[in-house]
UniProtKB/Swiss-Prot annotation:
GO molecular function, one term: 4-alpha-hydroxytetrahydrobiopterin dehydratase activity
Pfam families: Pterin_4a
InterPro entries assigned: PCD_sf, Pterin_deHydtase
Family, per entry: Belongs to the pterin-4-alpha-carbinolamine dehydratase family.
Gene3D superfamilies, per the entry: Transcriptional coactivator/pterin dehydratase
Record has Amino-acid biosynthesis as a keyword: no
HAMAP family noted in UniProt: Pterin_4_alpha
Protein name: Putative pterin-4-alpha-carbinolamine dehydratase
């Protein structure tokens, strides 16, 4: 998967398919908050995503407070959003919904 920065049009199209994800205020990242029933579910989600992110060699910027996980994705060496970010966002959506 490429680490080439996506165009604004490509990011907009991807966000339309990603549901609750949005462009961060910096314009170079995408973000989403995931809210779970409790801390255990939030932590299980983070563990599952961490294992997938490690395999992808692409790691989220995230934080967890009780049952909420806030995520920001970008590819630092590309200076913006890449296909890797979109792929990880899709994986996170899948883990959250399934």
């Amino acid at each position: 998967m490429t680490r080439e920065k996506l165009s604004k049009d490509a990011i907009t199209a991807a966000l339309a398919e990603l549901g609750d994800w949005s462009l961060a205020t910096d314009g170079a990242s995408i973000k989403r908050s995931f809210v779970f029933r409790n801390f255990s579910e939030a932590f299980a989600f983070m563990t599952r995503v961490a294992l997938a992110a490690e395999k992808m060699d692409h790691h989220p910027d995230w934080s967890n407070v009780y049952k909420t996980v806030d995520v920001t994705l970008n590819t630092h060496d590309a200076g913006g959003v890449t296909a890797l970010d979109i792929a990880l966002a899709k994986k996170m959506n899948h883990y959250f919904g399934g």
